[in-house]
Amino acid sequence: MLNPQLNRHGELIHLLSTEGLPRRIIEQILDLAATFVPAPGQEFPKLPLLHGKSVFNLFFENSTRTRTTFEIAAKRLSADVVNLNIAASSTSKGESLLDTIANLSAMQAGLFVVRHGASGAPYLIAQHVAPHVHVINAGDGRHAHPTQALLDMYTIRHHKGDFNQLTVAIVGDVLHSRVARSDIHALTTLGVPEVRVVAPATLLPEGLAQMGVRVCTDMEEGLRDADVVIMLRLQNERMRGALLPSAHEYFKHYGLTQARLALARPDAIVMHPGPMNRGVEIASEVADSGQAVILDQVTFGIAVRMAAMSLVAGVRP
């Protein structure tokens, strides 16, 4: 079966999911991102790699970190950046998604960065754009968030060196999390020997065992001797029905406190894709501790998105 993210030469042309993404492509992105990370105290480099290309940010769902870091990344690559105001666009007047894309393509769009509430929307767009136009998935429904997973992989590699002896615990609302799915695919592709998914039974999707992960409903069991702890927020906006008694009850059993973090390895790092809800999935004392690398994720996200845009466009320094 053909991989819609690659051309016939095996080169990246769209970034839609970490599922099925070859290890060599993931490592290419991480290695290229490393060349973009500025030295401490310096700014991100300004490079002409996307000079003359137009990058359209199409965010049909709200975003702060992802949209902003994509915009910064594109500008650092000298692209012309267009942020479409979805609420004021023709899509709010009934225009179809593909008609919107066709009209923007006629404006010489070179790259679409798409966040959409419908799983599969970026795939649909990628199937209908011209060969010289590229698509990056910035999050689609519950399905995938590949650049978040890639920046997570970069952060882990930066702090831990390699992946082949790590235990990684992903904790929280896995049922509704596109980040969890994308992280799992990336971690297993990169050879992490033990990936644990930790959540109450009501927030665990079916089929996790087939993804090669260990499922834990007990927080202490899931955290024990972990090298990396990735916390996920409760996605109340996607929940249907009473999946949890209360946020207070959730924190009581699944919130990451200093006492629970002590079950992990002493040098364990704590990550979070944001937005972070203190006192719900993570205690402030942990979020503000030296083990938390959450702001590193944001910084590295710019470099990783620079690398992703460069590779799909077929350019590099």
Curated annotation (Swiss-Prot):
HAMAP family named among the record's database cross-references: Asp_carb_tr
Entry protein name: Aspartate carbamoyltransferase catalytic subunit
Protein's organism: Bordetella parapertussis (strain 12822 / ATCC BAA-587 / NCTC 13253)
Gene Ontology biological process: 'de novo' pyrimidine nucleobase biosynthetic process; 'de novo' UMP biosynthetic process; amino acid metabolic process
Subunit note: Heterododecamer (2C3:3R2) of six catalytic PyrB chains organized as two trimers (C3), and six regulatory PyrI chains organized as three dimers (R2).
Signal sequence residues: none
Keyword terms, alphabetized: Pyrimidine biosynthesis, Transferase
Keyword Translocase tagged: no
UniProt-annotated binding residues for carbamoyl phosphate: R65, T66, R115, H145, Q148, G274, P275
Amino-acid positions noted as binding L-aspartate in the UniProt annotation, renumbered to this chain: K93, R178, R233
Domain of life: Bacteria
Pathway field: Pyrimidine metabolism; UMP biosynthesis via de novo pathway; (S)-dihydroorotate from bicarbonate: step 2/3
Reactions performed catalytically: carbamoyl phosphate + L-aspartate = N-carbamoyl-L-aspartate + phosphate + H(+)
GO cellular component, one term: cytosol
Statement: the UniProt record of this protein carries the keyword Signal: no
E.C. designation(s): 2.1.3.2
GO molecular function, one term: amino acid binding
The family this protein is said to belong to: Belongs to the aspartate/ornithine carbamoyltransferase superfamily. ATCase family.
Function description: Catalyzes the condensation of carbamoyl phosphate and aspartate to form carbamoyl aspartate and inorganic phosphate, the committed step in the de novo pyrimidine nucleotide biosynthesis pathway.
